[in-house]
Swiss-Prot record:
GO MF assignments: structural constituent of ribosome
The protein's assembly and partners: Component of the mitochondrial ribosome small subunit (28S) which comprises a 12S rRNA and about 30 distinct proteins.
GO BP annotations listed: mitochondrial translation
Xref: Gene3D superfamilies: Ribosomal protein S11 (3.30.420.80)
Name of the molecule in the record: Small ribosomal subunit protein uS11m
Length: 191
């Protein structure tokens, strides 16, 4: 009987033809025995219900203050601790703060034993990231948001170090200051 009903819905679709606009879509099997006006009403009602229901999933993290059902370790997005990474050409500094801006962990390439030109390398930034992650996980941090500032060579290495240290990164934000033709830049290096 079900096969007969499904073939009936196909017949109704083919009956509508190419030029006719009476039939909106494929009718469910239970609506075949109803009249054409009622069939159009039910199809229109289903379309408006689909359009009216908003999708709860978003590819982007929620805006602060916006309601969201997403949670990490039982915390809302606004309550997840933040790792601030300042990547300069000479050093990389990492500070992990709570949602209330209380410092949880701090590390830099200089505090990890790298000196002079070695502080500005990716290996030093990765080591500083691992050290900051170890200090933060000791205080119970499991998930983290990352805010990166600067264009140094340790940008991505520091994030990799945080993940290698056991923290799960849920968002990465680039907060590098960009002048809109502000101060005159420093002179170009002559090699």
């Amino acid at each position: 009987m079900q096969v007969l009903r499904n073939s009936g819905s196909w017949l109704l679709l083919s009956w509508a033809g190419h030029g006719m606009t009476r039939f909106v879509g494929i009718a469910p099997a239970k609506n075949i025995h109803t009249g054409a006006p009622r069939l159009e009403d039910s199809a229109a009602r289903q379309n408006t219900e689909r359009e009216a229901a908003p999708s709860r999933f978003s590819l982007y993290p929620p805006v602060p203050g916006q309601e969201s059902s997403l949670q990490w370790a039982g915390m809302k997005f606004e309550d997840v601790p933040i790792a601030h990474i300042k990547a300069t050409y000479n050093n990389t500094q990492i500070q992990v703060v709570s949602a209330t801006n209380a410092s949880l962990a701090r590390a830099s390439c200089g505090t990890e034993g790298f000196r002079n030109a070695k502080k500005g390398t990716g290996i030093a930034a990765q080591t500083a990231g691992i050290a900051a992650a170890a200090k933060a996980t000791g205080k119970g941090v499991t998930h983290i948001r990352v805010v990166v500032k600067g264009m140094g060579p340790g940008r991505w290495s520091a994030i990799k170090g945080l993940t290698m240290g056991g923290l799960e990164v849920i968002s990465i934000t680039d907060n590098t200051p960009v002048p809109h033709n502000g101060c005159r830049p420093r002179k170009a290096r002559r090699l």
